[in-house]
Every structure is written in structure tokens, then in C-alpha cells.
């Protein structure tokens, strides 16, 4: 989740998990959601949520990550915090899709997805073109990476990562 519930006095996202750990809420006549625990860090919140089908007793555990350091329509001031968030996101991901959302679902989410895709390409030592990544994303969902600042931020984050990798290479060298 790349938004806060309320930003600038406007509701950006309705809360879809219980407020209090160990509290269960029925979503409908079949699904029960329980916030198992939450942990507040500097720029994001980690929530462990349990979704139970009360008819079948099937339980799914969801790790919900809420990045809180990203202003609406802007960008984080530094790439490090977002990279920490992405690193943790990749660490907890076991299988299935990673689901991301912000308020409109294209600005911050699009920027996160673009950066994550390019980081994956870098880890495979593959060629990449950020503008092509964004173009392909926009073929699937119009408006991904919503503002010029977000587009520039994609380049800034990747440049930061490449410089760090180059510095590591020079040290071990």
C-alpha cells in the first residue's frame, strides 16, 4: 500500500483491516479478517493479516506493507527508504502475485512497479530502458507513473542503485 488513509485532509484509502491487533472483523457473511500484529517503522508499517473463510475454515496469511513516506503526487526525498521497503517486500514475498495500490493506482504504484521491474533486470544483468518499462506498463494500465517528478524519481533511484553497485565493485575490485 503506497498511500496513507488520509492525506491533505482527503480520504485516499478506506481501511480494510481491523484497527487493533488480535481483533477479528467480518467482511461479509463468509470472510473474517484478523490483524495478527503490526509493526511501525520509520517509513512503513508491516501488518500481518489473517483472512479466514468461515465456511471452509481455510486461512490465508497476508503480509501487508504500507509505505508511509511518500507524499501524494510527489516523491520520497531520498531513494534509500523506498529501496529498504522494496527489499523487505521482496524478502517476505513467498509465492503468488504482489499486489500494490495507492489512491488512484497509477502514480506511486506505477513508480514502485517500474523501480521493482528495473531492479529485477539489474539483478539478472539484463539491459533495460526505463522509458520502455513505463511505456509497456502504460499499455496495461493508462497513466502509470503519473507525474514528471515520479518519472524522474525512477531514474534517480536506479542511478543511486547503479552508483552503489559500482562503488561496491570498485572496493572489491
Regions found by a protein language model. Name each.
Residues 1-173:
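Cys-based phosphatases of the PTP/DUSP/CDC25 superfamily and their flanking regulatory architecture
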